[in-house]
Design a protein with these regions (language model features):
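Conserved active-site and SAM-binding loop architecture
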Residues: 1-148
């Protein structure tokens, strides 16, 4: 499969898919800490969603007809229900925080609506204020962890 892992600086998910033979690429606005710049698209993930010609950090071009799977980890600071309590300070709405939440929601929705057959958008329980779609499942790490495996 051709796999795009958006908002992934660590490359842990990318390396796991590569280990099983998939053509996986991480994409983030930060340089990767995972040691594989040849698998990393540095920059905004939104243009990469379309596929086509992508360039990895080793300056090599790769042509992706279409992605088979998108796994996205958009920043959750302004999207999660836990952060909603910071929208008001005293009795004053924190407009900058609201705007950051709206921008975060827009990024989330670009992933959610991407023209890719299999999509996973990982995020905590969303804030109701931002009208994000209802989550389809809740997975806690302890439900699947049988010891930590690092790839």
């Amino acid at each position: 499969m051709k796999v795009l892992i958006a908002c992934e600086e660590s490359q842990e998910v990318c390396k796991a898919f590569r280990l099983f033979g998939h053509e996986a690429y991480s994409c983030d606005v930060q340089e990767p800490s995972g040691g594989h710049p040849e698998w990393h698209i540095l920059g905004d993930a939104v243009p990469a969603l379309r596929g086509g010609q992508i360039v990895t950090m080793d300056d090599k071009g790769h042509y992706i007809d279409a992605w088979d799977l998108l796994i996205a980890h958009p920043p959750c600071t302004y999207l999660s229900n836990a952060g909603a309590r910071h929208l008001w300070k005293g009795h004053q709405l924190q407009e900058d925080r609201v705007m950051k939440g709206i921008l975060g929601r827009d990024l989330f929705m670009r992933f959610w609506w991407a023209d890719i057959p299999r999509i996973c958008v990982e995020n905590p329980v969303p804030s109701k204020v931002l009208c994000l779609p209802e989550y389809t499942q809740i997975i806690q790490p302890y439900q699947f962890e049988i010891g930590r495996a690092h790839v």
